């Protein structure tokens, strides 16, 4: 494994505001879908292999910083602050407060970085802690001349789709790529307005979301993050094994079914429940007059349907039937009615804070609760700031609570392999490694070409 015993020195901290300041600050309301998110931050980082020769990290920092100031003109929400209104609901103060920007140095070479254990090698070392604002950025120069760009986003303001839009636009501006039509984000909250009158009649939503009377309890068992490499052949084989009666399931459905079943097989008490949630982006299901309207929408457009079964049931059920359960779960939101109903449901219950039910694991009756979020459209190759595509990149989301979080992403090798970020109880991470070592390979430098050229 790589090295986690290294030091990061912050050389300078700045606040980067939009290069064209706003004439008047204003308040941007959160949509009803934003209001379903508790105060959570998520991180993302990108590793770039560089040579020490002809490499000036200071110039690279300035390039990124200048491009950030330009990008924030369009993505102005990221330069604001989350405040609370008289009802206690969050809203976005667009005041061009700016983004905390850290210049740092780490005394380690990229190929020695322990990517398998991001909790101790990446989180809060190469990805900054966000103390103020909506977004924080850190650019870290490495001993080998490489660079790591890390970002932390306030999830109440942006989902991963929104973050990806920003990252691609930021990189295009940095490399002065005039051949790419930079996306102009849409902050039209009216696109997600509730209907008048609200038309909520979906009992599925009542069973999927719960109200919070107090903040979620701190977990008894601290969850751990690990990153794995999965070969495309194993992914295809899982899909083949889960196909029955000609009903082909998606790779994500088959992977989720396999993970759900594997974790259940480690349970001792067959009566305990095992829950699986799948994050669904609603942009394709909220059609408006313009085909690009929701495509460019910046904010949260997510729902997390979940399904559950007993440990004993999952042990006895063939993988194909487990994949059918996952597919049926997703069918509940794969229609044009779910998201408008969810928006109306939130409106009917405001200002009560609701949260997806699967996030609140029942410690007495649940063996495990896991949420899988697809990062397979992670635009890794497009986050090129001018010195080449990233040699590695991943989202990092240690989101608290006792519900696990899993995100598969494309390998930088562009060969169909996956990088999978997993944030689970240690016993469950050990379990998948023990029961499926042919699938879950701890990520090491040997899977990635991270050695600098001189």
UniProtKB/Swiss-Prot annotation:
What if the gene is knocked out? Suppression of isoeugenol biosynthesis and reduction of several floral volatiles including phenylacetaldehyde, phenylethyl alcohol, phenyl-ethyl acetate, phenylethyl benzoate and benzyl acetate, but increased accumulation of homovanillic acid and coniferyl aldehyde.
The Gene Ontology biological process terms listed for this entry are:
circadian rhythm; green leaf volatile biosynthetic process; phenylpropanoid biosynthetic process; response to ethylene
Tissues in which the UniProt entry reports expression = Confined to flowers, mostly in petals limbs.
Question: Keywords of this protein's UniProt record, alphabetized?
Answer: Acyltransferase, Phenylpropanoid metabolism, Transferase
* Entry EC no(s): 2.3.1.-, 2.3.1.224
UniProt cross-references to InterPro entries, sorted A to Z: CAT-like_dom_sf, Plant_Fungal_Acyltransferase
How sensitive is activity to pH?
Optimum pH is 6. Larger substrate spectrum at pH 7.5, with a lower activity, thought.
Quickly give the catalysed reaction: (E)-coniferol + acetyl-CoA = (E)-coniferyl acetate + CoA; (E)-cinnamyl alcohol + acetyl-CoA = (E)-cinnamyl acetate + CoA; (2E)-geraniol + acetyl-CoA = (2E)-geranyl acetate + CoA; octan-1-ol + acetyl-CoA = octyl acetate + CoA
Give GO terms: molecular function aspect only: acetyl-coenzyme A:acetyl alcohol acetyltransferase activity; alcohol O-acyltransferase activity
One Pfam match, by short name? Transferase
Is Heme found in the keyword set?
A: no
Q: Which domain of life is it from?
A: Eukaryota
Induction remarks: Up-regulated by EOBII. Circadian-regulation with peak levels occurring at the end of the light period and during the night in flowers. Repressed by ethylene, especially following pollination.
To which pathway does this protein belong? Aromatic compound metabolism; phenylpropanoid biosynthesis
The active site consists of 155, 384
Query: Ubl conjugation: present as a keyword of the record?
Result: no
Assembly and partners are described as: Monomer.
Q: What does this protein do?
A: Acyltransferase involved in the biosynthesis of the floral volatile isoeugenol, and which promotes the formation of phenylacetaldehyde, phenylethyl alcohol, phenyl-ethyl acetate, phenylethyl benzoate and benzyl acetate. Catalyzes the acetylation of coniferyl alcohol to produce coniferyl acetate. Also active toward 1-octanol, cinnamyl alcohol, geraniol and sinapyl alcohol.
| Family, as annotated | Belongs to the plant acyltransferase family.
Name listed for the protein in its UniProt record: Coniferyl alcohol acyltransferase
Q: Which organism is it from?
A: Petunia hybrida
- High-level lineage: Eukaryota, Viridiplantae, Streptophyta, Embryophyta, Tracheophyta
Q: Which gene encodes it?
A: CFAT
